[in-house]
Amino acid sequence: MKTLLRLFLVRVPLGIGMLCLVLSAALSLPVPVKADGLASVPLEIVDSDRTELGDGLAHYRYDVVVGSGKYDVVRIHRIVREDRPNKPVRTRDAVMLLHGNPGSFAGFVAPMVTGVSEMDHSIAIFLAKQDIDVWGMDFGWALVPPEETDFEFMGDWGLAKDVAHTEAALTFARSIRVDTGQGNGKLHVLGFSYGGQVGYTLLGNETVQPRGLRNVKGMIVLDVGVKLENEGDREFYCAMALIDQASLESDPPVYVNRIGSLFNLAAYLASTDPDGTSPIVAGLTNWQAVLFIGASTERITGQFWHMVGGYLDEYGVPSSLRFTEDQLFVATVGTTFAPYYPVRIDFDTEQMMCGAVDTPLDDGLSQITVPILHIGAKGGFGPSAYASSTFTASRDVTTITVQRLPDSDEAMDFGHVDTVLARDAETLVWQPILDWIMAHRENRP
């Protein structure tokens, strides 16, 4: 989540079947990737597996080396319906899901990972059941283990590196799709939160590539932006960019944001001692603290959005959540949030949202022409983030705002994370996404 709790806490060509036979062997694919000055390297699969999910669905996972650094490894996921094991159906289209920070791909399949709620209450499962070839990726920082203590490697790990890794993952996905009979068509990108900012930047970069070398044909942005309409919102991120710049330039420099580990701790305490006194939010129980962090995010960070809508008292303390099951949210916080991510990606995205700083990361925005679907939560980034698409040259832009309460109750309305977890997210968010994908489906022979 963007700068979450920062003001509250010091930042303390191979077939699927064949692939399953070579789990212990490294396979190099001749796909170069270059990020932040790193030399181009071939993609190398170092681990993979397949899991049957039921209802004819399977989950494939590939750990792929995309650079020369210790943690230059991404985890690429595929959830797809199959005719038989290792034989995907001929899908109707394909999409790559990109998660937020400090999240992971698991957030898109939270019920499956946490065991809370029905497994198919998941945007990834929902789309796969409709014969969409669903891909996803864990950014490399999401795979850094909790026991890591040396974060020098995060010093130059910024948005550009994640964009390059995503481009490599898209190329990888297309190569697998060719081998499993899906053709070589481009993919849509669906970016939630930070993933949407990666999507905008990636598409901007692709505009300088020949059309035949581009990987993306359309973009779905889920409650985030790279440009904001509201001046107060822009000023907030200008201020946060200065704070992050100071962290990066301090002696010693601070390269890591540890907010994910705080989330993990808060959720652990809520699960093991729900009625105990919270060491994280004074005056609340451990259970209340997690709900407060989710439903009253604004009161902690000063930002204009919250993660999940809640039933709030006059102090902003939620009795429960409005749209997402309490237990699902707590379990998601505890199991799908990565403990660490680089400060530099906050700095990079804050500069873009600030709008007052010249950054090369948004240089390609004005050349983007692909179709864009931008869905905002009224209690999240919402309509303010729709300004992002006005900086592009796309003539096919659709915006959808999910609003469940009157304007006067915006502080309790449908939130940022409700878009992927809410009880009625399938109707309000996922079905419109599916409809848009089908409306932009490429003709097939």
Where do the language-model regions lie?
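Active-site nucleophile loop of the alpha/beta-hydrolase fold
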Residues: 220-229
